[in-house]
Amino acid sequence: MYDNIAILTNTMNNNSVEVEADNMRPGKSFDAYIASNKIRMFWNGKVYVGNAHGMEFTSSGPKLIN
């Protein structure tokens, strides 16, 4: 089971925000929700990457919880 919180970082300015995470598929993808906007994050082999409104975001994904 995974936490419902993740940290997204904007690659242009390195600003990080806490977002709601859902539909986690380890090593594949998860959905990040920020200000009611959904950003689909895809695994690139190192981090999850997603694009919205002309900006790129990265994340290590939500934490695994027991």
Where are these regions (language model features)?
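Cysteine-centric segments in proteins
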Residues: M1-N66
